[in-house]
Swiss-Prot record:
GO terms for molecular function: protein serine/threonine kinase inhibitor activity; RNA binding. This is Non-structural protein 1. The dsRNA-binding region is required for suppression of RNA silencing. It comes from Influenza A virus (strain A/Malaysia:Malaya/302/1954 H1N1). A motif (Nuclear localization signal) lies at residues 34-38. The gene is NS.
Amino acid sequence: MDPNTVSSFQVDCFLWHVRKQVADQELGDAPFLDRLRRDQKSLRGRGSTLGLNIETATRVGKQIVERILKEESDEALKMTMASAPASRYLTDMTIEEMSRDWFMLMPKQKVAGPLCIRMDQAIMDKNIILKANFSVIFDRLETLILLRAFTEEGAIVGEISPLPSLPGHTNEDVKNAIGVLIGGLEWNDNTVRVSKTLQRFAWRSSNENGRPPLTPKQKRKMARTIRSEVRRNKMAD
């Protein structure tokens, strides 16, 4: 096993422990608590994959961090902080919308890289909007926390979430997963649009209505449908 993989996991475990202490003292805001919950699942998955005990890894991670801080000068720390790019946390959903349980009559699940896509295939002929909470850096999506699909009535009918066992994903991973979710929902004649925040940072190839352009496959299917409709109309005449 790569020693850097192990040490990275150990440090992540300790830093999560520190953030948990901050949360326990009620010093964390909503984005902080969101990331804390997601990272806990991620660490459990990584620990299982690596075969490492989280408690033991946390202790070793503490030793690594303490050694680094002991060697780090205040001036070097200031320079590091000044040169590090700052990310922003953007929210389409409330805490209630993010934490709400939801159920599927006809569940479908697909794994796309490090992301899990879930949708209810029983949903038909609905107007649906995709909303997400995520961080942004350099005007691009950095980390997806959670994306959900809502009907006009507020029901959750789809979701994209990071896989705890496969931490890390790219902007393209998210974009591809959004395309899969939209395609699945539109297959049942649902009308899907994307929130303005997602349009700006994660789904740039959309039209002014917040809907993605048709793929070549969708265009061919639509052309066949139109031709069939024209033929039927001519026969009726």
